[in-house]
A protein has these predicted regions:
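The feature marks non-catalytic terminal segments
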Residues: 2-29, 41, 52-58, 62-64, ...
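Active-site beta-strand->loop->alpha-helix modules in alpha/beta enzyme cores, enriched
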Residues: 12-58, 64-263
């Protein structure tokens, strides 16, 4: 049965929780100490959906004293199914938690807008490596709606920088991925988004340690063992130094990920991996043009992959005045080149997975 959203009464010592299920992430509750928040409803709650500003481990307690450990996966948009439905539940949250929203539902199938994230892929068919939140839609176009949403491939997104300093952006990031059909939670690196990295490759090298970024790239390749990797334009699209550094370190990492002597820590943890093929946006050799605007997707009621890329980008409310998803122009989101291959050149040039048989670790 379909779950119904239930009205909640929320209480916690000294807290104003009146707006806690207002879908405006700017109404936040900041906890200065370990805090218990009690939620009461007139009917049994079967599921909760919570939005935090940062990952947090917490406990859920029902009236009979049953406890559930939550937040183990580090998701800031967290769906919780109660082991035993109850009309009163208590959230035990640690100091420094920033809680934005809480929604409760009767037992059953929750609405589609509730993000039920899966952990990152065990093995990815496709690994996509944007630098900042929104790059995945702007420069890679219909890639995510087509391969994740429509084809159901295991698609892992890993961001080279984080936006914890601008707390609204991680929410935009997750909302955009969810909108285009990605269901495996993204990897978000420990490298902060730094404005000083923008001007040139050299400026990016001054604020990021290139060796550390390369190690991070190698780790992603070994961890997710992708059949296909997708990265930025080596010239940084509109010339962004951090995009350039991302592409340059990725090209280096592709040569190292199969060698256990390079960055041995991640080799020990994940084993080594030789990537079959990697495309870069706008790479001038072995070019391929993905006609996202001519790909209607049944998973999205016939909207095209290009339309869905624009819909994903529209979730990045703080960025929409600066950019738009475009097929055409100098940063055409349809144009890619095969920058690295262990499976030969493309012939048909209409699918990133050309020459990737399922026996070679491609999609089943």
């Amino acid at each position: 049965p379909a779950a119904q959203q239930v009205e909640l009464t929320a209480s916690g010592e000294g807290l104003d929780l009146a707006n806690i299920n207002d879908p405006d992430n700017f109404n936040k509750v900041r906890l200065s100490a370990d805090t218990a928040i009690t939620l009461q409803a007139e009917t049994d709650i079967g599921e909760l959906y919570l939005v935090f500003d940062r990952p947090v481990e917490w406990r859920l307690e029902t009236a009979d004293g049953t406890e559930q450990a939550c937040g183990q996966n580090g998701f800031i948009h967290e769906y919780v199914e109660l082991e035993q439905p109850a009309s009163t539940v208590t959230l035990h949250l640690p100091a420094d938690t920033v809680l934005c929203e809480v929604y409760a539902f009767t037992p059953g199938q929750v609405p589609d807008w509730v993000q039920q994230w899966q952990p990152p892929c065990e093995k990815a068919d496709l690994l996509v490596l944007p630098t900042h939140a929104d790059d995945e839609h702007l420069w890679f176009g219909g890639t995510l709606p087509y391969y994740a949403g429509e084809k159901g491939y295991a698609v892992q997104v890993a961001y080279m920088t984080n936006h914890w300093g601008e707390p609204y952006r991680p929410h935009e990031l997750l909302n955009g991925l969810w909108t285009v059909g990605v269901r495996n939670y993204p990897v978000i690196s420990d490298f902060p988004d730094l404005y000083a990295s923008k001007e040139s490759l050299e400026s990016a090298r001054q604020v990021y340690n290139e060796e550390e970024v390369t190690a991070w790239q190698v780790e992603q390749l070994r961890r997710f063992k992708p059949s296909v990797v997708l990265g930025h334009d080596i010239d940084g699209e509109y010339g962004h130094g951090a995009h350039m550094l991302n592409a340059a370190t990725l090209l280096s990492a592709l040569e190292m990920s199969g060698d256990a002597a390079r960055f041995p820590e991640s080799a020990e943890e994940y084993g080594v991996w030789q990537v079959p093929k990697c495309y870069l946006h706008l790479w001038p050799e072995n070019t391929i043009q993905m006609e996202w605007g001519e790909m209607p997707l049944a998973a999205f009621d016939g909207r095209t992959a290009l339309e869905m890329a624009a819909e994903g980008f529209a979730c990045h409310v703080s960025q929409t005045q600066w950019f738009e998803v475009k097929a055409g122009g100098s940063n055409d989101c349809r144009k890619f080149g095969l920058a690295y291959t262990n499976v030969g050149p493309d012939e048909a040039k209409n699918d990133f997975f050309e020459n990737i048989p399922s026996a070679f670790g491609g999609p089943a």
